[in-house]
């Protein structure tokens, strides 16, 4: 069954919502097979796939390339496309065109936008254009320069109140769900309990309506120099197992153990004899 926006909305209060990032066809197939509710094609691909230092460098065209790869897998999960930096910051017209491309060309089911009150006009326009919108509050990575880095948000009473107000505003504006990132557990819990739409937490404690992680963090597809955030739990060590497989492959070809007979194609003995005679000519 293909999961839809109304389906996700109806999960609030009934069971925890699962969300996971995916950036390509095989990963989307795996996430769908695991029956994860939502696939986020996150701008985090700028870092974990393209090797940038932050999410600010990825473009709409680059994001669209990966959104198409994910939707080609025809996942049962709801597919949400992250709108990258500057794709919805300049004016409403550009925002509509960019979001429309993710829906029309990328075949995403919804888009995600970072920010609260200052995004109200854009979110209104997107929803008026029949584009479902997921909000994102708290530690919003596209604002890292203003925040002075990746810092936990809402740690004072005034900042917690602002997050609460922004969450209510996003709900009133028409967002179908909100990601809460990098906020104290009690703040995320309070927001979640006072909204009628689902909240999806990442570094926001266990009392949100759902959880999301970056899949490269979850499966351990990161080299040794990367240090996991506090909120990450690894469920695998894919990087290490990949390196191990590559080392074994290299050893096998150097020792002529691969390819073996079972990996090779043969031809009839009469044709082989003819080929040998032809080579002698």
Summary of predicted features, one role per range:
Residues 2-236, 240-281:
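Alpha/beta enzyme core
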């Amino acid at each position: 069954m293909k999961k839809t926006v109304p389906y996700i909305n109806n999960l609030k209060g009934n069971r925890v919502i699962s969300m996971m990032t995916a950036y390509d066809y095989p990963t989307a197939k795996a996430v769908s097979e695991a029956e994860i509710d939502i696939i986020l094609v996150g701008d985090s691909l700028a870092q974990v796939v393209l090797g940038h230092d932050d999410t600010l460098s990825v473009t709409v065209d680059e994001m669209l390339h990966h959104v198409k790869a994910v939707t080609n897998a025809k996942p049962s999960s709801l597919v949400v496309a992250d709108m990258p930096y500057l794709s919805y910051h300049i004016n409403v017209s550009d925002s509509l065109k960019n979001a429309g491309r993710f829906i029309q060309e990328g075949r995403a089911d919804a888009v995600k936008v970072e920010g609260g009150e200052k995004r109200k006009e854009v979110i209104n326009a997107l929803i008026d254009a029949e584009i479902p919108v997921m909000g994102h509050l708290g530690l919003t990575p596209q604002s890292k320069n203003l925040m002075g880095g990746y810092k936990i948000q809402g740690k004072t009473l005034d900042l917690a109140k602002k997050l609460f107000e922004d969450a209510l505003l996003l709900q009133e504006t028409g967002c179908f769900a909100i990601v809460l990132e990098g906020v104290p557990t009690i703040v995320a819990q309070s927001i979640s309990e006072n909204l009628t739409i689902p909240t999806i937490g990442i570094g926001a404690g266990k009392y949100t309506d759902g959880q999301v992680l970056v899949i490269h963090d979850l499966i351990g597809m990161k080299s040794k120099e990367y240090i996991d955030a506090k909120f990450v739990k690894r469920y695998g060590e894919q990087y290490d197992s990949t390196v191990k497989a590559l080392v074994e492959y290299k050893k096998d070809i150097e020792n002529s153990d691969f390819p073996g007979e079972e990996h090779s194609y043969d031809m009839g003995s009469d044709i082989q004899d003819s080929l040998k005679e032809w080579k002698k000519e």
